[in-house]
Every structure is written in C-alpha cells, then in structure tokens.
C-alpha cells in the first residue's frame, strides 16, 4: 500500500492513483513488489529536523528515505521537502511536476537498491530516474 500524507504543507497536486501505479511499475522493473510505502510531504524546516534527529546531518535536502525493505518487498517512509523540490525545479529549469515526480521515484529507486553517493553512482541514479519518468505522462 502507498499512502500520501502531509506535515505542515498543502498536499501537492498529484494524481495519486496514476502515481501509485507508476511506482509499482517501476518497482517491478527491478524485480520488486510494493509493501508499505508512506510519502510524507513536508517543509524545509521539517526535513531539516528529520535530517538532524535521525541522520545527524545538518542540512536541507529534497528527500530522506527510511528503508524498511524485506526481500523483494520494498517498504519505507519517504520525507519530501516541497520547498526544496520547488527551488530545485527553478534552479534546474524544470517544471515543478516533473521535479516532484523525479524526487518521488528517487526514493523508490533507493529502496530498489540504487545508490547515488559513490563514484559513478549519481549518473546511474539519474539514468534510472529518466527511464522511470519516461513511463509517466506529466
């Protein structure tokens, strides 16, 4: 099951049914099934609080993914800062909806085992994001 929640922000204008189907389709491409996924859309202040409290990182970010996966079933809590998504969309001259969906699927790709911190991994993640974005009409 995939749930969409907010904390201190207005729910973004996403097509939940279509987005949920897309997430399941992308997960299946990696041989994964969707378990319990919770998206928590929040502000920069909230994501900074979560980053400090749970990861001991003192900076803003667009997404924090807590991985609760078991076997081929992906589960997790995904905090997304709508403030950072908006500023990234402006910085990279992307439509807000495309940037939001990029971040939504970024967390799923992490749960599917794709990393983006090591040498060459960022490029692999970006290619996976672009492949996934091609599967949804925005």
UniProtKB/Swiss-Prot annotation:
Keyword field contains Hydrolase: yes
GO molecular function annotation: metalloendopeptidase activity; RNA endonuclease activity; zinc ion binding
Cofactor(s) the protein requires to work: Zn(2+)
Top-level EC class: hydrolase
Cofactor binding: number and manner: Binds 1 zinc ion.
Compartment annotation: Cytoplasm
Residues the entry annotates as binding Zn(2+): 106, 110, 116
Pfam families membership: YbeY
Listed GO CC annotations: cytoplasm
Family note: Belongs to the endoribonuclease YbeY family.
Reported function: Single strand-specific metallo-endoribonuclease involved in late-stage 70S ribosome quality control and in maturation of the 3' terminus of the 16S rRNA.
Protein name: Endoribonuclease YbeY
Originating organism: Phocaeicola vulgatus (strain ATCC 8482 / DSM 1447 / JCM 5826 / CCUG 4940 / NBRC 14291 / NCTC 11154) (Bacteroides vulgatus)
Gene: ybeY
């Amino acid at each position: 099951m995939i749930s969409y929640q907010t904390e201190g922000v207005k729910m973004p204008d996403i097509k939940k049914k279509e987005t949920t189907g897309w997430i399941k389709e992308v997960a299946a491409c990696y041989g994964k099934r969707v378990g319990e996924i919770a998206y928590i859309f929040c502000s920069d202040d909230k994501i900074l609080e979560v980053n400090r409290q749970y990861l001991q990182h003192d900076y803003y970010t667009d997404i924090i993914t807590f991985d609760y996966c078991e076997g081929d079933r992906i589960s997790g809590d995904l905090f997304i800062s709508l403030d950072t998504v908006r500023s990234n969309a402006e910085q990279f001259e992307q439509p807000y909806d495309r940037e939001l969906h990029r971040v939504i699927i970024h967390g799923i790709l992490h749960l599917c085992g794709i990393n983006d911190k090591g040498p060459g991994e960022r490029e692999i993640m970006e290619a996976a994001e672009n492949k996934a974005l091609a599967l949804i009409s925005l």
